[in-house]
Amino acid sequence: FVGAALKVLANVLPPVISWIKQ
């Protein structure tokens, strides 16, 4: 479960971070 959660976070975080930095 932890591995899947980290995989999802790895896929979701970059767009969110780039959006916040705009």
Swiss-Prot record:
Source species of the chain: Rana arvalis (Moor frog)
Glutamine amide sites (modified residues): Q22
Keywords associated with the record: Amidation, Amphibian defense peptide, Secreted
Protein name: Melittin-related peptide FQ-22-1
GO biological process terms on file: defense response
Subcellular location, record wording: Secreted
Domain of life: Eukaryota
Cellular component terms (Gene Ontology): extracellular region
Tissues of expression: Expressed by the skin glands.
Molecular-function GO terms, alphabetical: protein kinase inhibitor activity
Family annotation (Pfam families): Melittin (PF01372)
